[in-house]
Every structure is written in structure tokens, then in C-alpha cells.
Amino acid sequence: MKIGVFVPIGNNGWLISTHAPQYMPTFELNKAIVQKAEHYHFDFALSMIKLRGFGGKTEFWDHNLESFTLMAGLAAVTSRIQIYATAATLTLPPAIVARMAATIDSISGGRFGVNLVTGWQKPEYEQMGIWPGDDYFSRRYDYLTEYVQVLRDLWGTGKSDFKGDFFTMNDCRVSPQPSVPMKVICAGQSDAGMAFSAQYADFNFCFGKGVNTPTAFAPTAARMKQAAEQTGRDVGSYVLFMVIADETDDAARAKWEHYKAGADEEALSWLTEQSQKDTRSGTDTNVRQMADPTSAVNINMGTLVGSYASVARMLDEVASVPGAEGVLLTFDDFLSGIETFGERIQPLMQCRAHLPVLTQEVA
């Protein structure tokens, strides 16, 4: 099973709590995180894109770096780990993304790929005057389908004459082209999103579900497998989890309860409000899960809380789910979390038994 790190491009990572570590996103922090992840044989690093935060006492995600420029920098200071940036497709023409991706392919030596997102948080785009109207909620995957067709033209042949409802290319050129086939990933959880991933993505991200229920996402992975069978493609699921680990189950649980007790209710209210704006995409979208009050303090990603041995066992359970090809991990404290993962958790995982046991990286 592949292991990736979801780097904290926004302040405070993925914990919406006054009791969680409070920090600003910087290149130096993310450089340290990704280099440490590479040392411990993580397979990939991904950054999201966020253009407006949730506010509240913690100013959650009010402070964000930009994904492509961050990952270009990280590509230059790593050598093995795969690097993925996220394109907010309403903000960037596909021909520009094609050229930026080809550039980072050159920087990384063929280790780069692109995560495509349609955009769900209306204020991110409204503040710039580029929100296309609420009809977009029901047409966003039509838009993304044309977008990726332009990308594939340009990466594959260096030229596009695509004509569609959203994009018109007139002998559009991009050169140099990527040195290897460019990976495209997506995070579709709705039926429309999964249909898109089945047709165009190399793999699909989905949320884990619940606390210490590592296989609860299995129905989502099964839906992705079924969608891919319709297109005759192999599109695996990569599952998002937060790891909160300590020497004992009780110590880890105490940390989790402490974070929940400090939940930033004002920021969470903003998230709930935004999740209700899309009335056209159905009830199975990512943002609906993010805003569920059950565990909104970490946007309801699957959460693995326990001793190092318990977390290793649960991750092996994740690997046993049909269609699950990898996990994307976040941590309550990224630097110490990756270190303890690499030294105390990964060596206990059967699905990572092929890797050497490593000790702390020497600076």
C-alpha cells in the first residue's frame, strides 16, 4: 500500500481547534515535512489549494500558500518522492496548467502529477469575481471533463484544437512536453465525481470515515471499482486519514479528546454554512462529509487514534479493503508525527514490511 503525506499548505493543518498546534504555513516547514517523509520512504506528497478560510478564533485556513509554486520548490529539494499539486480549475486556464506541470516535471525529473478540483466553496471565487453562478454546481464535472481533455491533448501531442462549451483552443501549443505520462488525480465522491475519475484519473482520493473504523470507507472504494469497471480502467482509491498516535491507546485518546474540547465553533459554523450552498450535487459530496458534526474538528476525515501498534494494525486493515491502493496521511503534529510513523508505526505494518527500518534522519 502506498503512503502519502497531505502537506499543511494552510495554517494549523487539519485540526480546527484552539487546543491543537497553532502555526503558519511556510516553505521551510513544508520542506522539512516532505524531506522527512522522503527519508521514511513515503511514496508521495500532495498539497491542496485553498483561497479563503473559515475564520474563527483560530483563523482556520485564512493563511495559505499556493500549491504549484510550493510543490515546484519542494520538487527541487527532493529526489525520490512523488509530488502532486492541486489546480483550482476555475482560476487557471488548462493551457497554463499544462505548461506549469511540464515545468515541474522538468524540475522533478518526472516525479510530478496534478490533482484537479472543481471548487465547492463559493466565496473563494466570488471574492475574485470569477464565480460562474450556482448552476456551476450541477455542471462542474462537465467543465472538468473539457479541462482534462485539453490537458491530455497538450501533454500528449503538444497541440490542442479542442472546441467545447467551456473551452476553445485554436492551435494551442505547449512545449516541452512532460518527460513521462502526467498523472492526473481527483477526489470525486459524488456519482458524477467518480464517473469522472473512472474515465480520466489515475487514482481517486476519498475520505476515511469515523474514528478507529479503518474499513468503514469500503463502500466508497467499491463504488469507485464499479465505476472504473464501466470504463475498463484500473482506478484505485487512496484514502484520507489523520493519525493521532502515542505510546498507549489511552495517551493517544487523551490527545484526541483534548483537541475536540477546543473545537473552534465559529470556524466550524462557517464550514457548515458553506456546505449547504450546493443544493444541486446530491448528498454524497466531500463537503457534506466535511461538515458533518460527528467529527468536524478535523473535517471528518477518517481518524486513527491509538498506540503505535494499534495504528499499524488499523492501517493494515485499510490495506485489506478491495480497491484501496494507498493512504494519504495527516498528523496532529506533522514533524514529530512523520518521525514516529517512520520509526514506530511503519515497521509494524505488514503491508510495508518490504521497507528497511530507519532511524531518525541526521540533519
Swiss-Prot record:
Q: Name one GO biological process term.
A: uracil catabolic process
Catalytically driven reaction(s): uracil + FMNH2 + NADH + O2 = (Z)-3-ureidoacrylate + FMN + NAD(+) + H2O + H(+); thymine + FMNH2 + NADH + O2 = (Z)-2-methylureidoacrylate + FMN + NAD(+) + H2O + H(+)
**Pfam families assigned:** Bac_luciferase
- Induction note: Up-regulated by the nitrogen regulatory protein C (NtrC also called GlnG) and repressed by RutR.
EC number(s) on file: 1.14.99.46
> Is NADP among the key words of this record?
yes
Q: Where does FMN bind?
A: I49, K50, N115, E124, R140, Y141, S190
Q: Which domain of life is it from?
A: Bacteria
Q: What class of enzyme is it?
A: oxidoreductase
Q: Which UniProt keywords apply?
A: Flavoprotein, FMN, Monooxygenase, NADP, Oxidoreductase
Q: Which InterPro entries match?
A: Luciferase-like_dom, Luciferase-like_sf, Pyrimidine_monooxygenase_RutA, SsuD_RutA_monooxygenase
Q: Does the keyword Amino-acid biosynthesis apply?
A: no
The UniProt entry, under NCBIfam families, shows: RutA (TIGR03612)
Which family does the UniProt entry place this protein in? Belongs to the NtaA/SnaA/DszA monooxygenase family. RutA subfamily.
Please explain the role this protein plays, according to its UniProt record. The FMN-N(5)-oxide reacts spontaneously with NADH to produce FMN. Requires the flavin reductase RutF to regenerate FMN in vivo.
Protein name, entry field: Pyrimidine monooxygenase RutA
Instruction: Give the gene symbol.
Output: rutA
